[in-house]
């Protein structure tokens, strides 16, 4: 296959760090270094330093929406960015976000007539619920999201669970599972680095060490972990637990841990950006605890597997895909009692944990080179299908945009009419209440006058 020029589009990119930004960075680095040529297109950021990358990064105008959605929102209808990209000779466009990035990608497709692939990474229904309070507007946002995704020539998801989530939003088209990779090599780091990284914590070698790495948010299942550890301690088991990461719920989580009386056994390490130091924690631990049903990919589970560390996961979760219970990981129901029971069973079986970790390393590990290589091969098939006219024709974004604006205006009119009707109702109730108060005051005056006449 000839070398391809790939346009990678995403809403987040360094200095903003998340799983999708990491995926796009790896796609660009591997394609540009080994396979073809890649350009990243992403919103502008005043703190960005793109000189550090060995591939082109093209920025377009943005708004600061970090407090609302965690990253800057791009303005995809910028004519300047379209003019800049139009002459770059791209063979394919690959969007990694179904909102503004895909809007920009659709406009670019109309100009340069190449196929558009979109990867669905995260559960956007949760993001929509967090960002929009109105149920009516939430449903309309989901409809527009699905419409935007369906307008792509091919849709990929990072896991089967991500595909099921996409279906739950109303998407009815086909999709291909294209998993992400891990930027760790398979194997352990040096013992000297492990000792250096973990030296500040009370971690006796004779005790099992449990580990969590990720954002410190309750929706990651952290309450299940802490409640299970409290049960474990009450049962007389001795152990150690380390949480590595930052996040909006970190202080609440630490306070809850203190309330449970676990501070002698549970330690909190801030977020670590040095990847080898994170590997050191994976290599030091006996078991990785990740009872999250939120994540669509469970990348940290594959990171742990790269280091030979087995995970305890919720059966049926995306993170547990391809994991065989007792062979390449340990599966439980989504509650603290199940977690506690499994940990009690394993506390005295450190060799079993090690053997299962070795199987996880062999069965679950996927390098980014392998993951991007698969995607790059699929690019060739997508381009061929597009040129042969095998994908359905999609309406122009301008048509969709006009309809979306009309629908949004109708929703706004409906919302405004409801608010105005409610305001009129409140005014009427206020007038009635005011009149009732006047009448009540008059009755009280008359009653007092009658009593005074009686006694005077």
Predicted segments, located by residue:
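Nucleotide-activated donor-binding/catalytic signature segment of Leloir-type glycosyltransferases, i.e.
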Residues: 254-272
């Amino acid at each position: 296959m000839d070398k391809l020029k790939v346009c990678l589009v995403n809403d987040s990119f360094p200095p903003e760090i998340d799983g999708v930004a990491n995926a796009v960075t790896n796609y660009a680095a591997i394609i540009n270094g080994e396979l073809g040529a890649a350009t990243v297109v992403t919103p502008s950021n005043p703190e960005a330093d793109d000189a550090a990358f060995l591939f082109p990064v093209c920025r377009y105008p943005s708004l600061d929406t970090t407090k609302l959605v965690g990253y800057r929102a791009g303005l995809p209808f910028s004519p300047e960015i379209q003019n800049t990209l139009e002459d770059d000779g791209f063979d394919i466009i690959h969007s990694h976000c179904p909102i503004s990035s895909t809007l920009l990608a659709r406009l670019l497709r109309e100009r340069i007539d190449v196929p558009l692939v979109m990867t669905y990474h995260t559960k956007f229904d949760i993001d929509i619920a967090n960002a929009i309070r109105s149920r009516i507007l939430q449903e309309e946002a989901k409809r527009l999201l699905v419409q935007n995704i369906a307008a792509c020539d091919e849709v990929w998801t990072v896991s089967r669970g991500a595909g099921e989530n996409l279906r739950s939003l109303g998407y009815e088209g086909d999709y291909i599972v294209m998993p992400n990779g891990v930027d760790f090599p398979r194997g352990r780091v040096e013992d000297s680095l492990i000792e250096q990284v973990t030296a500040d914590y009370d971690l006796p070698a004779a005790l099992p060490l449990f580990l969590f790495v990720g954002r410190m948010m309750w929706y990651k299942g952290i309450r299940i972990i802490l409640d299970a550890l409290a049960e474990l301690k009450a049962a007389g088991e001795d152990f150690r637990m380390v949480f590595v990461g930052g996040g909006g719920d970190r202080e609440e989580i630490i306070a809850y841990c203190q309330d449970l009386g676990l501070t002698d056994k549970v330690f909190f390490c801030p977020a670590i950006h040095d990847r080898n130091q994170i590997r050191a924690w994976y290599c030091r631990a006996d078991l990785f605890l990740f009872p999250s049903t939120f994540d669509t990919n469970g990348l940290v589970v594959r990171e742990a597997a790269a280091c030979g560390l087995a995970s305890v996961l919720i059966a049926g979760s995306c993170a547990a895909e391809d994991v065989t219970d007792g062979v390449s990981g340990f599966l439980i129901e989504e509650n603290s009692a199940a977690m506690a029971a499994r940990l009690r069973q394993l506390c005295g079986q450190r060799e079993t944990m090690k053997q299962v970790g070795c199987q996880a390393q062999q069965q679950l590990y996927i390098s980014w080179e392998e993951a991007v290589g698969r995607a790059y091969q699929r690019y060739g098939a997508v381009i061929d299908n597009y040129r042969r006219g095998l994908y359905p024709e999609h309406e122009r974004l301008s048509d969709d945009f006009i309809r979306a604006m009309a629908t949004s205006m109708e929703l706004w009119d409906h919302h405004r009419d409801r608010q105005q009707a409610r305001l009129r109702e409140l005014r009427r109730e206020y007038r009635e209440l005011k009149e009732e108060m006047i009448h009540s005051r008059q009755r009280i005056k008359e009653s007092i006058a009658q009593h005074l006449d009686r006694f005077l």
